[in-house]
Structure formats: structure tokens, C-alpha cells
């Protein structure tokens, strides 16, 4: 039995510019990090040719007697699509779950796909690069499942750590952001993450953004170009181990993101954001495509306690936040306990 662990992410700047429809014409970039919330995938080979997938998060179970009978159904679609795309025809059981719910703005679906792709490659004894794993996971989400997604979730989870990722047509470059350890710790300590208590379907919002890009909607294009510039500026600031401007850059990026398309924000989110600014937050953003999920704020240490109290009092959940450096990891359970797979 193999167990895979792959981290989810927080994008600080540039989200939306990772859509191929945008960056292949205009170029894009993101600043993002993996965090200590994970997706988990367990796979076990079977003695027959059956395929079986379980998703405790969605309370879904799917079984097919053999490879050519596998269909893609809601709740277990990631497992089915990965197996079909990679043409893994042996019998297998797959269980998928995560710390962060799908639709919470932390890139859970992309991280789950990266996780399972990496596991199947390991099961086949194939060594693959971080880039290839990310690209394969993206193709499964975009081409097989027809999700209107960008590439940041897959790349961030596959590479792990705090990175600046440049998106150009036919070229994607991942640049690790190396800061002094005390500055990285200070940045992490100054960030507060809150769960709004409701998830959302990002496909509707992203589909509208893709439509706007294809139609060359000036408001959308100009906003995306602005967040791309902010992402580059944030990268320049962070690589100098300077975080003084970080909160303001988050705020600028959020104000630009709200102009991407309808549905990115709503009155409830706007009121919470304004309340946070009134109680110590320098800046912040909604994680993911928008509409719900998590709110991230940059706050000076002396203001953190008050901000946490204010936002939890109105029903938000404070989520502990810790940066991580690793991408997907694989554990062979039988090797760990000294047993045998036979």
C-alpha cells in the first residue's frame, strides 16, 4: 500500500494570470507557497482487475469491474480520470481525502491530482520531474475533466515551498524565493488565515474570466495585467528579505482581483474585509478564484489577537498557518511496518 501526501497552497499575488488563455498572449506570474494542510491518497493493488475509488470528503464510492468500464462521476472524478489518462489497467483501490475542503480556495483539487499522478508513477516504477507531474495533473483537470483552470495549483503543489512562477507561452519557470530565515518566520507570523465557513464552485467564476479574456474584455485584461505587475513587484520585495510592503501589495492585488469578473466577491466578503482593515489588518485577499473559501490577512503582531477575536466573533474560523518546503511525498506502508506486499 502506498500513501501519498501533497500540500495545498496559498497564492499571494498573480492569481488568474496562470490561465493559459491569458498568459499565452499577455504573460503571467504568481507568488505562492505551500502550507501545512495536505491532501492524502492511499492506493492498494488488487488481485483482480477491478477499479475502486472512495472519497470520504464527498461520501462517494465508485467501482468498475475493469479498466475499459471506468466512468467519470462526481466525487471520484479525480481518481477515475487519472487512471484513465495514465492508462493504468491493473486492479486498484484508491482513497482520496484532504485537510482543506474542495472549493475552499487553497487549490485542493490540483493538489489531489498531483498527489495521485505522483503515486501512480511511483507504482509503475517511473521517475518523473516536478514539471512533468504538474503538467500531467493540469492536463487531466483541464483536458479530461474540462475544468476552466490555470496551472498554479499543480505547479505549486508539485514543487513545494515559496516560489515565484513565470508563465509564458511554451515556457514556465519556477524560481524559489529565498529569504533570511528570521524574515520568513516574521512573514509567516504576520499572516492570518480565516475560513468563511462555506465553500464555492470556482468553475463558474473562472469560466466567466476565461470568457472575458477570449472576448478581450478591457476591464478583465487590464486587471490581470495589473496583478501580474504586482506579482513581479512582490517577488522583487521578498527576494530582498523586505516585507514592509507586503500588506499593501496584498490589498492592491485584492482590489484589482475584484474587477476580474462578477462573483469574485460579494457584500458579506466586502464587509468582513473592511472590518479586518478597521481592526489591524494592513491588507489581505480572498484565496482562490473568489466567491468564498478563505480570507488571508497581513497583520502586525500587536494587532493579531484583536483581529482574531473580531473575526471569530462573527463566525469565521481561524486556521493556523505554516509554510512548508516539500512537494508530494510517498510512503510505502509495508516498508514502514516491515511487512511484505505479497
Predicted regions and their residues:
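C-terminal nucleotide
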Residues: 1-13, 17-24, 30-32, 40-88, ...
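Short gly/ser-rich anion-binding loops that grip negatively charged ligand groups
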Residues: 65-73, 103-110, 127
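Conserved catalytic cysteine-centered active-site region
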Residues: 88-95
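Short pre-catalytic strand/loop immediately N-terminal to key active-site residues, enriched for Gly-Thr
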Residues: 98-104, 282
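DPxDG-like acidic metal-binding loop motif
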Residues: 106-126, 130
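Glycine-rich active-site/cofactor-binding loop and its immediate structural neighborhood
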Residues: 292-294
Amino acid at each position: 500500500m502506498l500513501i501519498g501526501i501533497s500540500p495545498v497552497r496559498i497564492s499571494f499575488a498573480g492569481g488568474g494570470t496562470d490561465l493559459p488563455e491569458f498568459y499565452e498572449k499577455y504573460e503571467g506570474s504568481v507568488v505562492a507557497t505551500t502550507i501545512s494542510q495536505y491532501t492524502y491518497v492511499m492506493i492498494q493493488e488488487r488481485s483482480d482487475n477491478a477499479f475502486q475509488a472512495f472519497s470520504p470528503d464527498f461520501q462517494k464510492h465508485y467501482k468498475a469491474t475493469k479498466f475499459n468500464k471506468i466512468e467519470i462521476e462526481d466525487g471520484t472524478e479525480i481518481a477515475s480520470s487519472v487512471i484513465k489518462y495514465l492508462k493504468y489497467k491493473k486492479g486498484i483501490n484508491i482513497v482520496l481525502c484532504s485537510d482543506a475542503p474542495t472549493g475552499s480556495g487553497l487549490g485542493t483539487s490540483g493538489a489531489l491530482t498531483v498527489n495521485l499522478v505522483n503515486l501512480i508513477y511511483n507504482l509503475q516504477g517511473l521517475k518523473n520531474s516536478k514539471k512533468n507531474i504538474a503538467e500531467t495533473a493540469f492536463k487531466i483537470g483541464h483536458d479530461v475533466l474540462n475544468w476552466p483552470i490555470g496551472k498554479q495549483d499543480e505547479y505549486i503543489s508539485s514543487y513545494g515551498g515559496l516560489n515565484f512562477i513565470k508563465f509564458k507561452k511554451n515556457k514556465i519557470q519556477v524560481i524559489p524565493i529565498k529569504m533570511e530565515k528570521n524574515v520568513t518566520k516574521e512573514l509567516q507570523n504576520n499572516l492570518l488565515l480565516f475560513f468563511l465557513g462555506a465553500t464555492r464552485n470556482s468553475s463558474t467564476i473562472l469560466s466567466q474570466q476565461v470568457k472575458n479574456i477570449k472576448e478581450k474584455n478591457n476591464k478583465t485584461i487590464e486587471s490581470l495585467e495589473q496583478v501580474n505587475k504586482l506579482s513581479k513587484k512582490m517577488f522583487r520585495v521578498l527576494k530582498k528579505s523586505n516585507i514592509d510592503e507586503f500588506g499593501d501589495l496584498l490589498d492592491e492585488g485584492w482590489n484589482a482581483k475584484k474587477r476580474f469578473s462578477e462573483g469574485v466577491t460579494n457584500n458579506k466578503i466586502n464587509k468582513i474585509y473592511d472590518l479586518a482593515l478597521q481592526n489591524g489588518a494592513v491588507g489581505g485577499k480572498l484565496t482562490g478564484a473568489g466567491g468564498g473559501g478563505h480570507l488571508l490577512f497581513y497583520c502586525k503582531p500587536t494587532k493579531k489577537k484583536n483581529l482574531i477575536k473580531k473575526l471569530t466573533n462573527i463566525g469565521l474560523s481561524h486556521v493556523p498557518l505554516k509554510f512548508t518546503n516539500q512537494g508530494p511525498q510517498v510512503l510505502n506502508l509495508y516498508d514502514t511496518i516491515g511487512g511484505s506486499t505479497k
